[in-house]
Amino acid sequence: AVLKDGSCGSIGYGIATAYAKEGANLVITGRNVKKLEAAKQELESLYGIKVLTVQADVCAGCDNEATVANVVKQAVDTFGGIQVLINNAQASASGVPLAEHTTEQFDLAIYSGLYAAFYYMKACYPYLAESHGSVINFASGAGLFGNFGQSAYAAAKEGIRGMSRVAATEWGKDGINVNVVCPLAWTAKLEQFRDAYPDAFKANVKMPPMGHYGNAETEIGRVCVQLAMPDFKYMSGETLTLEGGMGQRP
């Protein structure tokens, strides 16, 4: 099964759709039960797969280890194992300058992103080792390029990148490859960011050289499918920027 943390957003659903079209059974998590159930019904009816939905949220002050352990147990009990783990969930107060950030806003980003990836990777490790599986974590150009107003978000994402590189080193012996994707796609969340923080949006979001924003399924999700395929098994510890030519680095 493919376990996806954070599947109701535009990019998350695009990834789920790409895997569903390959015939993969899915475990999808999120906070909104109605959105999870709607996603389950649509994916199962369109693609003939099985989808397990589990309401789960990693947050400050919660028993996060128990929450994640419950998700993983349900996944294994339902499907017998886990072949792919995708950590896509993230919440943050993007647009708030560092000096104005509150501890609560910082915790929101770190718990929903970095801690969530940590708990899921730790809990899924035995099953990924058994299946010689793949981990695909999500980061962002916010951390790569120091985007204005995104200090907590960037901190969470760069923490995920560092942890992913360590996992690639430690888990290579188990046949697990671990990679990171930094996407740019036009989504409802990006629209909300534009409306809530117009100055930060203008400073950070440009039209990519390719002339369009990425499609969540075909240009982000399909790459995630390939990263778990045998042809890409030897690639591990890498960061891929799927930003239409905007995420160029030395």
Which positions does each model-derived feature cover?
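Active-site helix of classical SDR
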Residues: 121, 156, 164
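Residue(s) in the substrate-gating loop at a strand-loop-helix junction
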Residues: 140
